[in-house]
A protein has these predicted regions:
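N- or domain-start disorder-to-order transition segments that initiate the globular core
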Residues: 1-41
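Flexible, charged surface loops at secondary-structure boundaries
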Residues: 32-41, 71-78, 203
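Short hydrophobic beta-strand segments
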Residues: 38-47, 81, 209
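Anionic-ligand binding region
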Residues: 41-44, 61-64, 78
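Short acidic, S/G/P-rich loop/turn micro-motifs used as interaction or catalytic elements
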Residues: 48-55, 87-92
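Short internal beta-strands
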Residues: 79-87
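A substrate-binding/cap region within the structured catalytic cores of diverse enzymes
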Residues: 88-223
Length: 224
């Protein structure tokens, strides 16, 4: 077990995979998950977004190859699972199941499992009102440094509202999903392609930020 644990942590904390050194709390969380899973594979779960493009490109394929490589490097002790974020796309003004269906197919060829976010919403009883009825309570409970970072990022890839409104909605959505979607995936390690420095509280724990294709190249495949 210790050998498997060390191999998994070594891969996830390698310079070619993670964007930043994993801190002691994250490492401890990962160790606990590995222990809890015993001989079962550990799920590495992340959202895969959607934008305007209809067809997956070479960037998508290379990013999926990278996720497949992570599984291979751990001798399949890690299994990658993608949440295809059709609902996020819908909220941002993109309704593009064609692209996500093709991503699901390409991922399957690499033994990467997928689930549509809309199906998970249905499973846990979430609807649009839960995500769009945004109050200031969640926004105000986060420190100003969080809010400033989120406001700077808001509005870049959405077409429905102003950046300030989008920032509040995004923060609200992350907290609802953190509780509801996180419960569907217990004992999992989460990943994101974004920079999570100072923003780890937005995600289920533990969460790691990984390079999508290669070290030093930061892109969101669905927008590239």
């Amino acid at each position: 077990v210790d050998e498997n644990k060390n191999k998994i942590i070594s891969v996830l904390n390698s310079r070619g995979v993670r964007r930043e050194q994993l801190d002691s709390e994250t490492l401890k969380d990962i160790e606990n998950i590995i222990s809890a899973c015993g001989t079962e594979p550990i799920k590495l779960v992340g959202y895969w977004g959607v934008g305007e493009k209809q067809e997956p490109t070479e960037i998508d394929r290379k990013a999926l190859d990278k996720l497949s490589d992570i599984m291979k490097m751990t001798d399949d002790r890690i299994k990658v699972h993608l949440i295809l974020a059709d609902k996020h796309g819908e909220f941002n003004g993109y309704e593009n199941d064609i692209y996500l269906n093709k991503i699901s197919s390409i991922a399957g060829e690499r033994n990467i499992s997928t689930a549509f976010l809309s199906a998970i919403y249905h499973e846990v009883g979430l609807d649009a009102a839960d995500l769009t009825n945004v109050s200031d309570d969640i926004w105000n409970k986060f420190p100003e440094c969080y809010r400033c970072i989120i406001e700077k990022r808001a509005g870049i890839h959405q077409k429905k509202c102003e950046a300030s409104e989008d920032a509040k909605r995004y923060l609200h959505m992350t907290q609802v999903e953190k509780q509801k979607i996180g419960a569907v995936y217990p004992n999992c390690i989460w990943f994101t392609y974004g920079d999570i420095k100072n923003l780890k509280d937005l995600f289920p724990r533990p969460v790691i930020s990984i390079w999508p294709i290669k070290r030093g190249k930061s892109v969101l495949p669905w927008f590239s």
